[in-house]
A protein has these predicted regions:
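Short, well-ordered alpha-helical segments
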Residues: 28-31, 35-40
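Short, mixed-charge low-complexity intrinsically disordered segments
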Residues: 38, 42-69
């Protein structure tokens, strides 16, 4: 079974989230979860410490099964 990585950036301050982002299809749950963890770290670095602290930003991800794959 394949899994699609879905990521989202949210603000704990406002309670709002940006639209979900497709992080690609992965062959196993492990691959999807590992990619989600790494992509979360990369997204936080890209957002920057100042913006993350100011807006109380955080990144979430989930791995959804790909139907019919």
């Amino acid at each position: 079974m394949k899994f699609v990585l879905i990521m989202k950036i949210c603000s704990a301050l406002s309670g709002n989230c940006l639209p979900e982002h497709n992080g690609g299809v992965h062959n196993t749950w492990y691959d999807c979860a590992a990619a989600g963890s790494l992509n979360t770290l990369n997204a936080m670095a890209e957002l920057g410490r100042e913006d993350v602290n100011k807006r109380k930003l955080f990144v979430t991800f989930k791995c959804d099964p790909v139907i019919g794959a």
